Regions:
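His/Asp/Glu-rich metal-coordinating catalytic cores
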Residues: 70, 101-153
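Conserved short loop/turn motifs at secondary-structure junctions
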Residues: 64-67, 96-100
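N-terminal active-site segment of His-dependent metallophosphoesterases
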Residues: 2-83, 87-91
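Proline-centered loop/turn at the N-terminus of a beta-strand
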Residues: 93-95, 120
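A short linear-motif detector with a strong N-terminal bias
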Residues: 37-38, 74-76, 98-101, 143-145
Length: 153
């Protein structure tokens, strides 16, 4: 999903353009069929689309891999995807969270190194209060929505 509608302030200023991806399931095999080539094609298309649309932020929300312990090939494919994505849209912030198919500790593995590159990965919820971010609440013409406390990126 790509959020491609411009959000405008009362002064007509653009606020943010956001890409939201989820359930990539990299490394998935379907009925013993290896989907690596198909996944590579789709990930390349996502990179091309991001380069064209230049989002401010990219959120990859869970199920990055299909297994908690992904194959080396799946990890390499995702690494190549994120590298290409960052090269195509260097100004974009990339945020990733683990899903139920991912290993939270593995997602957290290089968290501190990636922070320096404007890449945020969260596997486990933060343990310290200062690592949490504020509650997100929206109140607009469409109604009120309270998203509760979210984890820090």
């Amino acid at each position: 999903m790509v959020y491609n509608k411009l959000i405008l302030t009362q002064k007509g200023q653009i606020i943010m353009k956001l890409f939201h991806l989820s359930d990539l399931h990299i490394g998935l095999k379907l009925m013993n069929r290896d989907l690596t080539e198909d996944q590579q094609y789709i990930l390349n298309r996502i990179v091309q689309y991001a380069k064209e649309k230049q989002p401010d932020a990219i959120m990859i929300a869970g199920d990055i891999y299909d297994k908690a312990v992904p194959s080396a090939e799946a990890v390499s494919l995702f690494d190549s995807f994120v590298t290409s994505l960052k090269e195509s849209v260097p100004q974009s912030t990339i945020m990733m969270i683990s899903g139920n198919h991912d290993s939270a500790p593995r997602i957290d593995c290089f968290r501190q190194v990636l922070l320096k590159q404007n890449l945020y990965m969260v596997g486990n919820p933060p343990e310290k209060e200062e690592d949490h971010i504020e509650r997100i609440t929206l109140n607009d013409n469409y109604g009120y929505q309270d998203y509760g406390q979210t984890v820090a990126l």
